Amino acid sequence: MNFKFSYLALFLFLISCEETAHNLQDENLSLSIDTVSFEIIQGTTYQVPPIMGGSKFLYLGQNDGYLFDYNYIRVSKFSNSQYYISSDNIISQFHDYNDSTITIDSVRLSLNFVDDSISANSLFYLRYFPNVSDSVFSRNNTNYLNLNTNYSDIIDYGKIEIDTTSSKLIFSIDPSHFNSFIDTSNLNFNNVFAVGIKNAEFDYYKFYSANNGQSTVSKLSVYFKHTVNDTLIIDTLNTHNIIDDLTILTPPDLVDLDTTSLSVSLAKGLKSLITVDTKLWNIPDGSVFRKAELIFNTINQDSSDSDIINSYLLTDLQYPNVFTRFDEEDFTYDITNGSSAVINNNALKFNHRSALEKALSNKKSLHTFNIQPNVDVDPFKTIRFHNVKSSQFYPKLRITYVLP
């Protein structure tokens, strides 16, 4: 008997066993493979305030009911290059500008538009946060319901600069406002600006986020004079990259399909829950989990194969059974045992082997899973899946295991 060949054949057979229950026995291997399916007993969509912290772009204005209220932007206190002042002094971060030989002439904040050519009737404006001691915003938590509005009055209106390769939105910052950033008595200043827009009834504008990479990152430029001696004054500049940013958006009104199907959307803040009842079933003694597939079927026929969706087993006990809005995320995920999947041929299959193996070992029969879009999915796409009432495409859980 060629055991290497037999084990290879078994492995290939395991891969093919997906759609229905199978039982394979081999006198020499003494192994069998079983698949058991469970129906979803409950499913619903819920909404939380949208958070765009993972997006590669920033938005201002409004479009299709979305209101892009503000961009919150954090500047690095460290300069991109060090400027040598003397043997004992260099400029490498904000507070280093406080030197008797340094005079700040002007400060400019530039944001990079995605489009090369911009024609704007809107008015962009800039604020900052001189009286806020904390970090102002978090890309994972800040939204239109909890944003910090303790900002200054408008300190500048932006100008658009266009050259042959790019378009930029430029703000000029008076050095008096920049003093908060370089104050040596507050080395942990928030370093945050808020960029807003007026007269944007029909327009929205798209900028590169710091998440998009170094080649398109926006910058703060500090122009200053260095007085070396009575006869030598050097005019130069330092740049500081934007290291963190976030679009604050208000979502549009939902349509019926958003709430009657199992829907996920970044910009609408839509996520979905499903609950599986495995009743008294447990994996037979000595068996090994091969996979535990949670399967959904999309309603959207144009869903891209690149759409990545994440799923987590929830550890809470109470869940809504109808569409519900929350002011903040109300559930606790088992993050370490999460699963991600790509939509393929209108089907989405998560392997929740680790999460379910753990839950079943704890004698749990009800298992509730969350599904939500990955941070790099098109934020304005709503992906909808058939719910538990579908006669043919309802979601299901299918566990495959190997029994010696």
Predicted feature locations:
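Secreted, disulfide-rich extracellular signaling modules
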Residues: N2-Y7, C17-P404
